[in-house]
């Protein structure tokens, strides 16, 4: 049994909502549309970890970011090439997630998310 890649309790993610002060001095609290992901172990392999940052934007951006955050590790674990060709698997997974958004019930017409994902193995 190989040693764990990370010590138990050594990983974490933090995200915080912000605010905006308008030109007339009003304070407007903004919905936090960002999500972070640490999926360990991942891909059904003890030494594989998926890290991700999902920056939601526009209407429903927080929902698109949350949906994408949940779907990336799930779909990567199911992809037949995730261990042998993770670059191709990630490309396929993002295309699948984008195509599945309408059926998810999330209206992403005026919103979405930008993602950065890394697989450490």
Kindly give the residue locations of the regions a language model identified:
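PP2C/PPM-type serine/threonine phosphatase catalytic domain
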Residues: 1-121
